[in-house]
Amino acid sequence: MKVEDLKKDYDKLQIKYGAKNLDSIYNGGCEDNPDICFVFMNPTGRNIASDKSWEGRKSPWLGTKNIWKLFYKVNLISEDVFNKIQEKKPKDWDYEFCDYVYEEITNKKLFITNLGKCTQIDARPLPDEVLKKYLDLLFKEIDIIRPKIIITFGNQVSSIILNKKIAVSENRKKYHEIEINQNTYKVYPVYYPVGNGIFNIDK
């Protein structure tokens, strides 16, 4: 099975739980044993690829800036790529540039995804019950790519993935383990990056 094969399942859940006029946002990056798999919460309409007329890749954070600033600050993307991102307005992100950014993510052996793939109009919080509908699919995603470590953003996402109550503030530099298909993965819960949030994990 490939990551691509999961898209039809995500699209069904978008119809059920997402904004009717927007498409699912899937994932992007290195799909072959990445060093880090980043798991965010769920996409919003700020991602230019959520528009139904968009025919390019539908990966997280396209047409936005804050997350890329964060990745640059912890040396996960090059200064050259970061500067090009900063120069662009959302409407200037064309298919070619989106591929260029994710080529960098792939080359750095990173994979970016969301627990929930159901795109919302804005950053409204989703109830646990909705995010849990995506858990089995996320585990399939992880099983396909086999990341070395997983970083989960925020209490809600971390708690659902680890199946126990997690307070990120009490988990600085600590990891938990999950088992998926007889493989064990280290999971590091970190603060959800709001604005210029920073990772609470040493590189």
Spell out what each predicted region is:
Residues M1-I149, N155-S169, Y185-I198:
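A polyanion-binding, active-site-adjacent surface
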Residues S169-H176:
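Catalytic phosphate/metal-binding cores of nucleic-acid and nucleotide-processing enzymes, i.e., regions
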Residues I178-N181:
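Active-site-adjacent alpha-helix of alpha/beta-hydrolase-fold enzymes
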Residues I201-K203:
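Short, intrinsically disordered, charge-balanced linker/junction segments flanking boundaries
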